[in-house]
Amino acid sequence: MTRILKRLAAAACMTLTLSVAFAGQPLKIESITYEPQANVNGEQLLLNGAGLRTKIFFKVYTAGLYLKAPARRNTEAMAQNSAARVRLGLLRDVSCASFIDSLNDGIKANLQPAKEKAISAELEALRSLMRSIGDVKTGDIIDFDYSPDKGTTVHLNDKPVGEPIGGGRALYNAVLAIWLGDNAIDDGLKKKLLKSGD
């Protein structure tokens, strides 16, 4: 009996060791690699989850969610007032108009009219940044970042686009809701980003 218990304990230790070893490994989805950590305005973030966005039968992009603390529910992710990042890796060319329409639809589906009106100026500033990017191509990386000091920032292929947008966490949560909201654009992707779903 003692020998069996020792073997079970050894197996458990091995499983734990492997789990720890693989926890910090990069995650590759299609052609896009997500590092286990990201730095946003000096804050170290951890990859919370990542997945694939499909529309009809087409693979559109991959998405990764980086947070300061793990979140398994959308409310947990949105309650954090620390830095955060949503990274998109494009798997096909998308026109500027289509991209902005998708953002608008995702925000409107999850934001009450009064709350949308309260941040209308910030939302228009975000649309303006996206218009300045223009059409996006296969392989492009778009980051939607948030930090309490700067607000919401957008990067294209690791280069900043325009200036940071204020509006505090309200604007960024409106962006997060596109993928994490109760009416998220892709339920399967939402579950991957949260590693469980709501």
Please state what every model-predicted region is.
Residues 187-198:
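Cysteine/selenocysteine-centered motifs that mediate thiol-based redox chemistry or coordinate metal-sulfur cofactors
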Residues 24-78:
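N-terminal secretory signal peptides
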